[in-house]
């Protein structure tokens, strides 16, 4: 079983590094891992809060990770925050422009996010990308 991890609102890289070292999880913040023909890449943190990234840095982090996925058939993008304009934001939480730009640029098959606890389980499509707020419970799906 492979486990990917990335920081949310309150975790710093020290905490993520500790969990990677202790449990062998894969840090997805700016990195990828591949399983067969599936490539997973991500960006943690949020565009608000203690450890915030600006929109340009969000996109650059996702691009850096995505650029190494040249030999996979399917891509999964994992972020803490939801994309700008998503129904996941309930019209109150604007989401990330950088994440929306990444969806439109890289066209991952699936985008997994969290951040808004109240919309756990909501799914939508942005272009051809299936966007899922997995929340705390998570979601199991197969390709």
Give residue ranges: language-model regions.
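A broad, low-specificity signal for short, low-complexity segments enriched in glycine/proline
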Residues: 1-7, 91-94
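Active-site glycine-centered loops adjacent to acidic/histidine catalytic or metal-binding residues
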Residues: 8-9, 80, 114-115
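Binuclear metal-dependent phosphoesterase catalytic core
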Residues: 32-37, 53-57, 100-110, 117-143
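Conserved catalytic scaffold of divalent metal-dependent phosphoesterases
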Residues: 11-98
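Hydrophobic residues at beta-strand termini and immediately following loops
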Residues: 6, 43, 132-134
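Proline-centered loop/turn at the N-terminus of a beta-strand
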Residues: 1-4, 26, 39, 74-76, ...
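Short Gly/Pro-enriched loop/turn and capping motifs at secondary-structure junctions
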Residues: 82-84, 116-119
């Amino acid at each position: 079983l492979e486990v990917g991890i990335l920081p949310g609102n309150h975790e710093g890289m020290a905490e993520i590094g500790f969990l990677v070292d202790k449990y062998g999880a894969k840090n997805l913040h700016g990195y990828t891992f591949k399983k067969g023909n599936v490539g997973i890449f991500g960006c943690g943190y949020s565009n608000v809060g203690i450890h915030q990234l600006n929109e340009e840095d969000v996109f650059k982090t996702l691009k850096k990770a995505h650029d190494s996925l040249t030999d996979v058939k399917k891509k999964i993008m994992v972020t803490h925050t939801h994309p700008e304009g998503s129904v996941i934001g309930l019209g109150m939480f604007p989401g990330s422009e950088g994440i929306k730009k990444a969806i439109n640029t890289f066209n991952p098959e699936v985008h997994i996010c969290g951040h808004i606890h109240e919309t756990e389980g909501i799914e939508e499509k942005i272009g051809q990308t299936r966007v899922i707020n997995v929340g705390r419970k998570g979601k199991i799906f197969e390709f």
